[in-house]
Amino acid sequence: MAASWRLHCNQPLLRYLLGFSSRRSLGLAQGAAAWPVDRGASWRWFHSTQLLQADPIKVLMPSLSPTMEQGNIVKWLRKEGEAVSAGDSLCEIETDKAVVTLDANDDGILAKIVVEEGAKNIQLGSLIALMVEEGEDWKQVEIPKDVSAPPPVSKPPAPTQPSPQPQIPCPARKEHKGTARFRLSPAARNILEKHSLDASQGTATGPRGIFTKEDALKLVELKQMGKITESRPASAPPPSLSASVPPQATAGPSYPRPMTPPVSIPGQPNAAGTFTEIPASNIRRVIAKRLTESKSTVPHAYATADCDLGAVLKVRRDLVKDDIKVSVNDFIIRAAAVTLKQMPGVNVTWDGEGPKQLPSVDISVAVATDKGLITPIIKDAAAKGIQEIADSVKVLSKKARDGKLMPEEYQGGSFSISNLGMFGIDEFAAVINPPQACILAVGRFRPVLKLTEDEEGNPQLQQHQLITVTMSSDSRVVDDELATRFLETFKANLENPMRLG
């Protein structure tokens, strides 16, 4: 095929052939200034290998949460050359909060996967794939030259042979004839070593054959009288060391104590003192960063109260009879939402400059996942009933554990609740999740005997089901007096479920 052709045509026809009716420019100038020729002019143009190759559509690493700085490519859901429509899923991206599906914004063909699945720490805005429009030759797409090479997919490090560790020999023992027949007291041992004497030169007079301090002093007197001589072992040349060893490590007493084993080289298998580095996921790094910032910058104050669940448990049993299944935690969420509606001064956040009053009560509920703790949000919880809250918690908890939460389902919130009661914890204090001002930590409910009065005023013992709740509050926004009144109101609402209607 010839490399070029000569085409004679008029201006409107040439515009049509060159595709200026499409949405993409082919690299030629547009407008009247670009067409300074009249009818019948002669044009030279190249065939499709040069002219019809349009710029590809770039797929960039998106920002899927306010705190996201990097992302990991978990899995590509489409293959190169596969047609996609707007809204189709392209890949799964692990953010600092969850695993989110990235959807296509345009119709076209996935032409080039730039960043392979499994790649980690991809910066926001980095090129991860290229697409072309339908009908274009996707095989001809090349990665732009200004794009840096994608980071390599992290692979587990190959096992390496441990480097030989310098062997530190134990101090040489002095040989003492018959030492095995004697059990030396500590004082006797020191005296014998100091005067270079051997216990076999004397007689043990202590209980159970122990060579005592007095026995050692008798040997010293005999030595001074010249009746016995020093007992020194023949000196042996010091062993050669492959590495420099401190002098104190080569010299020791005649009766050495066990030496502390040296710390081994990190990564050396099956050696004392070794450790294994655990790769931190994006979620774990963000959790560590935010909790550290919270404890170091937010002045935490704590208030604790015991709540009687007797009435709640009775209502719950009545609901079960009507096949309505709700948990104690659902009642706690509802009670917190009602209390926040009654006391809007607690439904605030701190943005660094001052408090912000929030119009909606959005409660973040802590959910434990394999990758860490995440807090999906019950939006406008004060306007929802118990059963509606229970349904929302079930759906969001499942999505959180499956890593399918959307960013809007865990970003924001005005108040947090963390419940460890199912793990048998009586009470604990939780760390505030900035910019929120408070978090409520809930323990397990437990039976407690309390002395009460019957209708006639007679004292009697009754069993009560109590839970302990501890509220951590930001003292910059919620002072101790306000936190105390909030807990009092919360306790009253929870112990009287009729108030939660």
Swiss-Prot record:
Domain of life per record: Eukaryota
Span of domain Lipoyl-binding: 56-132
Pfam families reported in the protein's UniProt record: 2-oxoacid_dh, Biotin_lipoyl, E3_binding
GO CC, one annotated term: nucleoplasm
Keywords from the named record: Acetylation, Lipoyl, Mitochondrion, Phosphoprotein, Transit peptide
PTM note: Delipoylated at Lys-97 by SIRT4, delipoylation decreases the PHD complex activity.
Modified residues (N6-acetyllysine): K194
Sequence segments annotated as region (Disordered): 145-176, 228-256
Keyword Magnesium belongs to the record: no
Record: transit peptide: 1-53
Protein name listed in UniProt: Pyruvate dehydrogenase protein X component, mitochondrial
Organism field: Mus musculus
UniProt gene name: Pdhx
